[in-house]
Amino acid sequence: MPSTYINILLAFTMALLGLLLYRSHMMSSLLCLEGLMLALFILSTLMALNTHHTLSAVLPIVLMVFAACEAALGLALLVMVSNTYGLDYVQNLNLLQC
């Protein structure tokens, strides 16, 4: 396995570990999710370039669209929670349940 793939998998693992460890604040969780999506995007792009299939080139674009939607929804939720409660703790999301 080339060192490029090892570095990308290490970045994915570190972002996943950060998501598991720093889940108390919403902003840090969103940053770790963006790191996960970026590592997946780079890995899927490299895989699409190495396989030389036309259909596999669509996957990174779809993944980037979902990452942009996730970032927009996450930031909207962060703004709403911080304006309502004044904090960005994830525990405040339990208060939003009906």
From Swiss-Prot:
Primary enzyme class: translocase
Keyword Transmembrane helix among UniProt keywords: yes
Transmembrane domains' residue ranges: 1-21, 29-49, 61-81
One GO-annotated biological process of the protein: ATP synthesis coupled electron transport
Gene Ontology terms: cellular component: mitochondrial inner membrane; respiratory chain complex I
Membrane topology: Multi-pass membrane protein
Any one GO MF annotation of this record: NADH dehydrogenase (ubiquinone) activity
This protein's UniProt keywords: Electron transport, Membrane, Mitochondrion, Mitochondrion inner membrane, NAD, Respiratory chain, Translocase, Transmembrane, Transmembrane helix, Transport, Ubiquinone
A Pfam family it matches: Oxidored_q2
Catalysis performed (reactions): a ubiquinone + NADH + 5 H(+)(in) = a ubiquinol + NAD(+) + 4 H(+)(out)
UniProt-listed Enzyme Commission number(s): 7.1.1.2
Location of the protein in the cell: Mitochondrion inner membrane
Main location: mitochondrion
Record-linked InterPro entries: NADH_UbQ_OxRdtase_chain4L/K, NUOK/Mnh_C1-like
Self-association state and partner proteins as the record states: Core subunit of respiratory chain NADH dehydrogenase (Complex I) which is composed of 45 different subunits.
Summary of the function given for this chain in its UniProt record: Core subunit of the mitochondrial membrane respiratory chain NADH dehydrogenase (Complex I) which catalyzes electron transfer from NADH through the respiratory chain, using ubiquinone as an electron acceptor. Part of the enzyme membrane arm which is embedded in the lipid bilayer and involved in proton translocation.
Family that this chain belongs to: Belongs to the complex I subunit 4L family.
Protein name as annotated: NADH-ubiquinone oxidoreductase chain 4L
Biological source species: Choloepus didactylus
Organism lineage string: Eukaryota, Metazoa, Chordata, Craniata, Vertebrata
